Curated annotation (Swiss-Prot):
Example of a GO cellular component annotation carried by this entry: plasma membrane
SMART domains noted in UniProt: AAA (SM00382)
EC number: 7.1.2.2
Membrane protein topology class: Peripheral membrane protein
Subunit organization: F-type ATPases have 2 components, CF(1) - the catalytic core - and CF(0) - the membrane proton channel. CF(1) has five subunits: alpha(3), beta(3), gamma(1), delta(1), epsilon(1). CF(0) has three main subunits: a(1), b(2) and c(9-12). The alpha and beta chains form an alternating ring which encloses part of the gamma chain. CF(1) is attached to CF(0) by a central stalk formed by the gamma and epsilon chains, while a peripheral stalk is formed by the delta and b chains.
Keyword field: ATP synthesis, ATP-binding, Cell membrane, CF(1), Hydrogen ion transport, Ion transport, Membrane, Nucleotide-binding, Translocase, Transport
Name of the protein this chain belongs to: ATP synthase subunit beta
Its job: Produces ATP from ADP in the presence of a proton gradient across the membrane. The catalytic sites are hosted primarily by the beta subunits.
Name of the encoding gene: atpD
């Protein structure tokens, strides 16, 4: 087994020297375990730190990024090259379980009993293997299926502020895919608040969708290496269900912006020259490498729903702008709609879909969707007049438009199965 020694530790960055001719490859996993240390380096407490090789510095030295805290590491400690990238458990054993970036369970329910482990760095399906789908993924959510339908194997951006219903919408999607399609879901919490992750886990257990879901979390308090790689861990779990079990999988990434943010931190730690607005120069490459793995193949599909945080509401910021290039549909949640008590609070005019096309959804569906948007657009234009002068100042035709629009709004709202315990209304 190839072993080296630590020669420098600066925060989450660790430099390791290996014997001549035995340098580990880029992206290889390195393990530092308390069991393998010489007597003079034993600290009295057990630990296991996983590093990932990021650079070869010359002179048989590699620079690696830690996936957990480097507290307790010191120069001279023994490091073991695993001779492969980080591997994580995959398969049915991961369903209902909560794991971290290196596949260790963090739900205190014992080891994940999976015999199969896959590396998190994998190549995207080839041209021949890809099977671009034009098939609609029926979600059972009226406003989505009518106005911004999701494509099987597509990527959907979910935009929304705090408290407008992103989490409930995600849970309903997971529930509907599990019950109506018999499919599996994978939830990757990227730079999540730990409290929100805990809430989601409890709610999933109560609503009964946990048995069809694998969860992987790299919380806000984790080092940037873990937050940068946790999306790949979730994606690898989803790829196994797609490629080995021929499943149509739903992959949730919340929040894709944190993936970019963590990459920016790692880039700065490695001393790379920053690009526009301080982001890493490899931003487009990192995003593309991950997004290209989310696709339909001749075996199954991965449909991805990604929550997108927009810094300072600036859509031209390089992080959201790079994400937009990969999306097939956008679902925008609007606070003004949730304030009316209309849930899901999807904005029917701001939400878009690439497959809302008469050649794919059919002429009738397309015409109805456009007519609905036309009525809602007219209603929006009349709202200023209504708020200032009142309904009495409208013409009979305009009053009819308002009545139609309000009925459409109510029709496009619905009770969710997963919210039944809170609302008392059946889904």
């Amino acid at each position: 087994m190839n072993q080296g020694t630590i020669i420098k530790v600066v925060g989450p960055v660790v430099d390791v020297e290996f014997p001549s001719g035995l340098l580990p490859n880029i992206n290889n996993a390195l393990h530092i375990s308390s069991d393998e240390q010489p007597e003079d380096k034993k600290t009295g407490h057990d630990f296991k730190v996983v590093l990932e090789v990021a650079e070869h510095l010359g002179g048989n030295i590699v620079r690696a990024i830690a996936m957990s805290s480097t507290d307790g590491l010191m120069r001279g400690m023994v490091v073991t090259d695993q001779e492969s990238p980080i591997t994580v458990p995959v398969g049915d054993a991961t369903l209902g379980r909560l794991m971290n970036v290196v596949g260790d369970p963090i739900d205190e329910a014992g080891e994940v009993p999976s015999e199969t482990r896959w590396p998190i760095h994998r190549s995207a399906p080839t041209y021949v293997q890809q099977n671009p789908s034009k098939e609609i993924l029926e979600t059972g959510i009226k406003v989505v299926d009518l106005l911004c339908p999701y494509v099987k194997g597509g990527k959907i951006g979910l935009f929304g502020g705090a408290g407008v219903g992103k989490t409930v919408l995600i849970q309903e999607l997971i529930r509907n895919i599990a019950y109506e399609h018999g499919g599996y879901s994978v939830f990757a919490g990227v730079g999540e608040r730990t409290r929100e992750g805990k809430d989601l886990l409890v709610e999933m257990r109560e609503s009964g969708v946990i048995d069809k879901t694998s969860l992987v979390f790299g919380q806000m308090n984790e080092p940037p290496g873990a937050r940068m790689r946790i999306a790949l861990t979730g994606l690898t779990v989803a790829e196994y269900f797609r490629d080995e079990q021929n499943q149509d999988v739903l992959l949730f990434i919340d929040n894709i912006f944190r993936f970019t943010q963590a990459g920016s931190e790692v880039s700065a730690l490695l001393g790379r020259m920053p690009s526009a607005v301080g982001y890493q120069p490899t931003l487009a490459t990192e995003m593309g490498t991950m997004q290209e793995r989310i696709t339909s193949t001749d075996k199954g599909s991965i449909t991805s729903v990604q929550a997108v945080y927009v810094p300072a509401d600036d859509l031209t910021d390089p992080a959201p702008a790079t994400t937009f290039a990969h999306l097939d549909a956008t679902t925008v949640l609007e606070r003004s709609i949730s304030e009316k008590g209309i849930y899901p609070a999807v904005d029917p005019l701001a939400s878009t879909s690439r497959i809302l096309d008469p050649r794919i959804v059919g002429e009738e569906h397309y015409e109805i969707a456009r007519d609905v948007q036309e009525v809602l657009q007219e209603y929006r234009e009349l709202q200023d007049i209504i708020s200032i002068l009142g309904m009495d100042e409208l013409s009979d035709e305009e009053k009819l438009t308002v009545a139609r629009a309000r009925r459409i709004e109510r029709f496009l709202s619905q009770s969710f199965f997963v919210a039944e315990q809170f609302t008392g209304n059946p889904g």
